[in-house]
Amino acid sequence: MEVLAAETISQQERLQAIAEKRRRQAEVENRRRQLEDDRRQLQHLKSKALRERWLLEGTPSSASEGDEDMRKQMQEDEQKARLLEESIARLEKEIEELENADTLPAPVKETQVAPSPGPVVPAPCPAQEDRKAEVDLNAQQTPVGTPKEKRISNTPMRMVEGSTMMNAAMYSVEITVEKDKVTGETRVLSSATVLPREHPPQGIKVYEDETKVVHAVDGTAENGIHPLSSSEVDELIHKADEVTLSEAGSAAAPETRGPSEEVVRTTPSRREITGVQAQPGEATSGPPGIQPGQEPPVTMIFMGYQNVEDEAETQKVLGLQDTITAELVVIEDAAEPKEPAPPNGSAAEPLATEGSREENQVGPEAPASDPQDLDMKKQRCKCCSIM
């Protein structure tokens, strides 16, 4: 009976220890949330004060009511910033105390058991049961976001919980950021994935959780370093991914153009065409399978039929609506030895020379008064249409 009573007492103590541990974890989570909110408000107040100070420096020396109001607002913001800094320091101290309280070993209580004639079952040590219960609680009922790992290392290697074996980091990312002192916005300049190093660069650790460790390396003295929250780290990683994708897209465009330009430079011209100048890229601009001497295929798209019955509509469709038609009729007389030249001297000159050549050939054989000669002269009359 005494053994059962001792087991009951140890079980009650174990349950009390579990409940106390849950309460401390809940307090730690609440203080962490409040700490992140205070840091965010402090950052906002600092950026606001910096902007107002910059505006006041640019105004003329003559004071006005607006400047006085702005100075009062700046003093109030500075007072709020001091209060927030004190609150942040207090919360950090409380969180550290609660976390140290979790790591302290539980006091070992000895249970006196009276001797009995029967076999005595050794009572389990409460400290061992408490540790076992804490491990089971961490494995099954740990709330989301609770830090399980208390040890902080200065290298990319991380300790596996419950053992002395180290878990090496899979990869490292170097991110170059620039912070606007006026707006407080952080902009990512470049991002590069590198192999994890055994000894990290000399810097300040600003964030660490179960999967990530963030060190601030350069610019620590100029910009001032404060610990980052999980949301800020996630936003920084997201911006770095966007910069990496944009750099990869800009680098892929010259690579796709490079081989075609080299082919154009190294391919000799196999055929010489008079009057045609080869342009760069003509050999590779056409579809595959077409030789340089062949013409590229023409794609024709059927747009439909159009019925035209009116002659005026036909000329309109064909683009001949504004054309002028003229006829030139030349009638020769037997008494005239020479044809009159046309006014412009362009259209009928070849015909006149041809007619005079025929007269020279036919003249000695037949007289000018022969009716057959008149018929031939009439047949030589030409009509031309000027479009």
UniProtKB/Swiss-Prot annotation:
Disordered as annotated region, ranges: 22-78, 98-133, 246-297, 334-378
Modified residues (Phosphothreonine): T142, T146, T244
Positions with biased composition (Low complexity): 286-297
Lipidation positions, renumbered (S-palmitoyl cysteine): C381, C383
Post-translational modification: Phosphorylated.
Record lipid sites (S-farnesyl cysteine): C384
Record's compositionally biased regions (Basic and acidic residues): 25-41, 69-78, 258-273
Pfam families: Paralemmin
Single biological process term from Gene Ontology: synapse maturation
Propeptide stretch(es), residue numbers: 385-387
N-acetylmethionine, modified sites: M1
Job description of the protein: Involved in plasma membrane dynamics and cell process formation. Necessary for axonal and dendritic filopodia induction, for dendritic spine maturation and synapse formation in a palmitoylation-dependent manner.
Protein name (database record): Paralemmin-1
Species per Swiss-Prot/TrEMBL record: Sus scrofa (Pig)
Organism taxonomic ancestry: Eukaryota, Metazoa, Chordata, Craniata, Vertebrata
